[in-house]
Amino acid sequence: MARWQRVYWLRSLFFALVTSVNSLSLPQSENPAFPGTLICDKDEVRVEFSSRFDMEKWNPSLVDTFGNEISNCTYALDLEKFILKFPYETCTIKVIGGYQVNIRVQDTNADVSYKDDVHHFFCPAIQAEIHEVSEIVVCMEDLISFSFPQLFSRLADENQNVSEMGWIIKIGNGTRVHTLPLKDAIVQGFNLLIDSQKITLHVPANATGVAHYVQESSYLYTVQLKLLFSSPGQKITFSSQAICAPDLSVACNVTHMSLTIPEFPGKLKSVGFGQRNIPEDQWHANGIDKEATNGLRLHFRKSLLKTKPSEKCPFYQFYFSSLELTFNFQGDMLSTVIDPECHCESPVSIDELCTRDGFMDFEVYSHQTKPALNLESLLVGNSSCQPIFKVQSLGLARFHIPLNGCGTRQKFEGDKVIYENEIHALWENPPSNIIFRNSEFRMTVRCHYIRDSMLLRAHIKSHSSPVASVKPGPLALVLQTYPDISYQRPYRKNEYPLVRYLRQPIYMEVTVLNRNDPNIKLVLDDCWATTFEDPASVPQWQIIMDGCEYELDNYRTTFHAANSSAAHSGHYQRFDVKTFAFVSESRGLSSLIYFHCSALICNQASPLCSVTCPAPLRNKREASKEGTMTVSLPGPIILLSDDSSSKGVMNPDSYEITKDIASKTLGAVAALVGSAVIIGFICYLHKKRIVRFNS
């Protein structure tokens, strides 16, 4: 039985070797006496006969296993191209793994048929492509391991023979795909392992196609993998993606662990540790803060971390066990697991040098030990010296002790004068089931002077300071819009684009920022509107020219004085724009409008501050153009016509304009009707008078 299984497997292997990976057409030539080639297509079988074959003499037909012609088989025979086509369902016999094809080629002139006239073929069943996604990805420093389910057990029996047969590896980085046959991939360090349970592919971290991202000392790489296997009748695609962060930069201070993630196309959505998974919008509330400049930095409060004794450190070490980072990468949610840990840290921070005025400064952090220190029990030496600052909730105590007090000792080592003391503290809430070798915390603190150091006092006589050179600084102007004429609160940047309808005025203001000088004044030069964000783009609608209403505009801009309560009213320029100004017969209504203004700052006494409207000449302020500054609205304004279906509640000012126009129109119509009645009545009297005269 095993021998026949071996023969069947070798037969399948033969088909795999002669079949193209991407083609579904399988040429069959089992019977060399057959005068043609049989091709197994996806939907039908095609037989191509030799051009020397006499189709009329040799009549090909499809028969069953007994040699009888299949009655319901409908086939197409092209005598000119020497091609025979027929479907699988009605013209073949379905067997395990495919279809049996029996073709009889018989001389039509012969009276007797022979058994050797029937030729037998086999077409494997064409199966749909199978897609498998790996859920087991293991990141290591120098390779990534992908595991996939085993779909064909016989491959495990001949792993050495089939490992390079029909396999293609594709590695992508989002923009380019690198394709390798398995035999070439193995040479480059890839490894494919197949057993009865799974298929495992090892991809080197330095393989072509793996994308690497580095920032400072942080290192991260991403892999997009496709492993393809093709054999007659089937095509299997194993796919997976991975984000690996084998070496992220970790920095720890007294209160936080900081983790640096290089900038790459993925976006971090959540972090998980222990039994917790914390989404981005809940980080701050759970003791995690982020910085999103030049990559991403996460700051974890140390209360979230675990501690462990370490042979490398004299004190306990803070760490995360299996910190899971979940990213949105290329439309998929991918996770990577890391184990960051803080370097060895001391619960006491001390300046190496003693202070110049004869003191030793150091800080004690209660949470740098396990259990934490009880700051209330802190002692320095054998004295009662207290810290100058202590907050139990922050876990911090700061000392400033004299070198000639609090039990500080002095000694000489080489060229240094060393001052040292010892601090004592009790543990805070130690667990009852743990026996401590020491009942209290003890640590020696020290600072030093260089032995030949000498404190000098000097008086340095300096020259008088130079006179400051005064020049105007850069201007800071802003252009804003307001909901109404009260100019109470401008629209914020996130409220753009704004929506306005025809007949609604747009209230604008140009303001000087960060200037308190009452002697300066803001003067508008030009204001205009464009359909693009660029102030220099065309077309343009002029709103203000040389500080005056644009004379060619049918709907003039109206200026508004700043309130008397406003500080430095000369620092403001307020006006409203009529939306009719942006409608013309040739252009129609532009739905998206950007506004821009150029302005200058001048001294109140300067002639430049005097604006006469209408401006007599365009070159009135040409000499001052270098001092102007162009500002734009934070965003565009969408203009809608009156009949827009999206129009909501009408603005009160708009309503008044509409009501005024309607009343005037109604009055005109009434006057016209009245005139017609009067003229008709006069004509009637005149006609009646003529009739009387004739009679």
From Swiss-Prot:
Pfam families on file: Ig_ZP2, Ig_ZP2_3rd, Ig_ZP2_N, Zona_pellucida, ZP-N
Any one cellular component term from GO for this entry? egg coat
User: Which compartment or compartments is the protein found in?
Assistant: Cell membrane
UniProt tissue specificity: Expressed in oocytes.
Residues annotated as glycosylated: N72, N161, N173, N206, N253, N382, T444, N563
Residue ranges of every copy of the ZP domain listed in the record: 353-616
Q: Name one GO biological process term.
A: humoral immune response mediated by circulating immunoglobulin
Q: Where is this site: Cleavage?
A: A156, D157, N619, K620
Query: Where are the residues of the annotated region Disordered?
Result: 451-473
**Sequence ranges on the Cytoplasmic membrane side:** 686-695
Per the record, the similarity remark reads: Belongs to the ZP domain family. ZPA subfamily.
According to the record's subunit comment, the protein's assembly and interactions are:
Can form homopolymers that assemble into long fibers (in vitro). Polymers of ZP2 and ZP3 organized into long filaments cross-linked by ZP1 homodimers. Interacts with ZP3.
The name this protein goes by in its record: Zona pellucida sperm-binding protein 2
